[in-house]
């Protein structure tokens, strides 16, 4: 039995079995407005053409990404990740105290995990900041 305040079957309420979401409206499809379609991808974007017909410069080759970064710990085997070395760990922190991601620091996955663990250890021992205080 449907409650009168919730809307019965096929009504535009928010709780009926065919209400199509919160917004009433008959039509099929889920979503929040009921929608007029069954959730299909409408063709209102127009013909965008093939990827290679979009223009741009015709030169092949690489984009100007610059030099590939190498992991400093893999390059120099004598260098170790040490949570007690504040200067080394600060290199991998932003000025806000966040850990710099791998794609920016250039670390390999193994050493990025070690750096992240070392930074977290340093934070627990109050060697490194969690955040930088606002003045």
Curated annotation (Swiss-Prot):
GO terms for biological process: translation. Residues 1-65 are annotated as: Disordered. Pfam families: Ribosomal_S18 (PF01084). Keywords: Ribonucleoprotein, Ribosomal protein, RNA-binding, rRNA-binding. It comes from the Bacteria. Transmembrane segments: none annotated. Gene3D superfamilies: Ribosomal protein S18. InterPro entries: Ribosomal_bS18, Ribosomal_bS18_sf. GO terms for molecular function: small ribosomal subunit rRNA binding; structural constituent of ribosome. One of its GO terms (cellular component) is cytosolic small ribosomal subunit. The keyword RNA-binding applies. Residues 42-61 have a biased composition (Basic and acidic residues). The keyword Disulfide bond does not apply. Residues 9-41 have a biased composition (Gly residues). HAMAP family: Ribosomal_bS18. Binds as a heterodimer with protein bS6 to the central domain of the 16S rRNA, where it helps stabilize the platform of the 30S subunit. PANTHER family: 30S RIBOSOMAL PROTEIN S18, SMALL RIBOSOMAL SUBUNIT PROTEIN BS18M. Part of the 30S ribosomal subunit. Forms a tight heterodimer with protein bS6. Belongs to the bacterial ribosomal protein bS18 family. NCBIfam families: S18. This is Small ribosomal subunit protein bS18. It comes from Anaeromyxobacter sp. (strain K). The lineage of its organism: Bacteria, Pseudomonadati, Myxococcota, Myxococcia, Myxococcales.
